[in-house]
Each structure stands twice: as C-alpha cells, then as structure tokens.
Amino acid sequence: HEVLAAASFDAILLDVPCSATGVMRRNPDVKVIRRKNDINKFAALQSELLHSVWKLLKPGGRLLYATCSVLPQENDAIVGSFLGAENTAHSMILPQKVGESTAYGQQVIPSVLGGDGLYYSLLVKPLL
C-alpha cells in the first residue's frame, strides 16, 4: 500500500461511491437494497474522500467530483460543506454544461435527457 505525497496531481477525477439512484433504470435492484440510512453513510464517506483527496491536488489543480446519484445530500450538500470548510477551494463553472445547473455543479436527471442520472462539480485549488 503506497502512500501518495501531498500536492502530487494536476487533476483528479473523484468518482465517489454513492447510492446509485441515478442508474436505477438499468439497476432496479437499487430500489430494493438501499435503506434510508445508507444515504448518510455514503455522504460521510464522500465527504471523507473529498477532504482526503484534496490534499493530493497541486496548487492550480482541478478536481472533478462526480456521483451517479440524483440526491442533493450526495451532491451539492457534500460540495457546499467542503467549500465551507476548505478555504483553498472554489467551484468553477464549466463552459460546456450538461444537465441542470445547481449551486456548485451540474445535475443530469434521467427523465430529462434520457440515460443515467449523474452529478459533477469542478473544484479548483488556487495557486499559492
């Protein structure tokens, strides 16, 4: 198990484990196996991963936070809380948007565009 040095990466794609509510059309078992308290567990893990991985990003680097969830608790709530706690982060609006704009990112809703639901938010670490 190799330990990575802080500020090692220019860019990171953080596709976190989630409730998979955006892919229920293809995976209907999600409706049966998910419990209400699963969302809180996923949210805690997502927050922990985001805070941990942020340390690996170089100044000037970009991190794309992504889920296959349509739940705000796993998306904007995680990013908003992170931005409130991490003063070296800000969200960036992507020039080419897919989905509906949210406070901190973009949400793709399956019933609107077809396909799977997902969320993404681009976070930037300022140069020192």
Predicted regions and their residues:
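Arginine residue identity/basic-tract feature
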Residues: R25-R26, R34-K36, R62, K97
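C-terminal catalytic and target-recognition region of SAM-dependent MTase-like enzymes
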Residues: H1, A6-L13, P17-A20, N40, ...
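Conserved P-loop NTPase nucleotide-binding/switch module
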Residues: T21-V32, C68
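Glycine-rich S-adenosyl-L-methionine
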Residues: V30-K58
